[in-house]
A protein has these predicted regions:
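A cross-family phosphate/adenosyl-ligand binding-site feature
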Residues: 1-195
Length: 195
């Protein structure tokens, strides 16, 4: 169906998900799983370093991770729909977000589809959630996070919620994914304090 036919029709909301090379591929996978249980259409891009980290940290194949998304984009495809502000989305989550990616986004460098899509998300005033995964943090990291927060991004440290009663590492990482989904304003089942 062409875009012309869809104009004015009700579309599914879209969310862009990026997985970069920081340790913690499980955060991106749990995010995709959480979003799959909603009505949003997910657009996934995995950086080359993200693919390497996935292969080192997990037993998930590239195909298994990509199958969790509705649409998968190549990280070098700078003409992808998600690289344009005219392609409407609810927002974008980078999970995990390496400090390299965070630095590129903070400085406006758009050398990959991940940083370009994040740049578009910011310029269009859409929600950008960065699941930062680094420890300890240098002053440069903190300044980049400050610049991004001032530009409208949300820095969501990869700090699990232990009070939710998770029994394993994957479930703990799921608490961070649930927070990212909530920050996007997507209606989904997740643990809420006091509920």
């Amino acid at each position: 169906m062409s875009e012309t036919v869809l104009r004015g029709a009700r579309r599914r909301e879209r969310v862009v998900v990026a997985i970069t090379g920081a340790s913690g591929t499980v955060y991106g996978v749990r995010l995709l799983q959480a979003l799959a249980a909603t009505t949003v259409e997910t657009h996934l891009v995995i950086s080359p370093s993200g693919q390497l980290t996935r292969s080192l940290e997990t037993d998930w194949s590239k195909e298994e991770v990509e199958s969790l998304a509705d649409v998968v984009w190549k990280p070098s495809d700078m003409a992808a729909a998600i690289s344009s502000g005219s392609f409407r989305t609810r927002g974008m989550v980078v999970a995990p977000c390496s400090m390299r990616t965070l630095g590129e986004i903070a400085s406006g460098v758009t050398s990959s589809l991940v940083s370009r899509a994040a740049d578009v998300t910011l310029k269009e005033r859409r929600r950008l959630v960065l699941v930062a995964r680094e420890s300890p943090l240098s002053l440069i990291h903190l300044r980049n996070m400050t610049a991004l927060t001032e530009a409208g991004a949300v820095i969501l440290p990869a700090c699990p919620s232990f009070y939710a009663g998770a029994q394993d590492v994957e479930a703990l990482c799921g608490t961070v994914a649930d927070r990212a989904v909530a920050l996007l304003g997507v209606d989904a089942e997740h643990y809420e304090w006091g509920e």
